[in-house]
């Protein structure tokens, strides 16, 4: 990571993505976690399998605020190549209860 993420659950999620560790990814989430991509709610499991784990996915954080609760990253997978993305996380009891992601504007 080139930017500092200090929230342990967010660190764990990023590490899981970069290691291709599906179990660790879901362990960083609450059981009822939800997500949206480009403003549309998605089935989290289906989305993660398609976007992060079938590819394989990589995530390089470029900038982060609020301990990583809001960040800009370069995401890479075999389907879409490299995209500049935003991520916003909501935490509950030390885990991620929701994240919103989508394409970010140019740097």
Question: Which residue stretches match the model-derived regions?
Answer:
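Hydrophobic/anchoring residues in structured secondary elements
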Residues: 35, 64-66, 101
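A short gly/proline-enriched turn/hairpin at secondary-structure junctions
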Residues: 28-42, 50-51
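Short beta-strand edge/turn micro-motifs at domain boundaries
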Residues: 84-107
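Surface-exposed, charged secondary-structure patches
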Residues: 44-92
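Short beta-strand segments enriched in hydrophobic/aromatic residues
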Residues: 29, 75-77, 103
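Short hydrophobic/aromatic-rich beta-strand segments that constitute the beta-sheet cores
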Residues: 35, 71-73, 98-99
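Hydrophobic pocket/interface hotspot
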Residues: 13, 24-26, 33, 44, ...
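Short, low-complexity N-terminal intrinsically disordered segments enriched in polar/charged residues
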Residues: 1-19, 24-27, 31
């Amino acid at each position: 990571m080139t930017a500092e993420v200090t929230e342990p659950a967010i660190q764990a999620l990023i590490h899981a993505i970069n290691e291709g560790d599906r179990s660790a990814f879901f362990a960083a989430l609450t059981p009822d976690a939800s997500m949206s991509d480009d403003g549309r709610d998605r089935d989290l499991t289906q989305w993660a399998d398609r976007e992060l784990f079938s590819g394989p996915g990589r995530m390089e954080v470029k900038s982060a605020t609020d301990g990583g609760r809001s960040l800009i990253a370069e995401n890479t997978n075999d389907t879409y190549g490299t995209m500049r993305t935003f991520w916003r996380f909501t935490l509950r009891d030390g885990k991620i209860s929701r994240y919103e992601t989508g394409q970010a504007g140019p740097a």
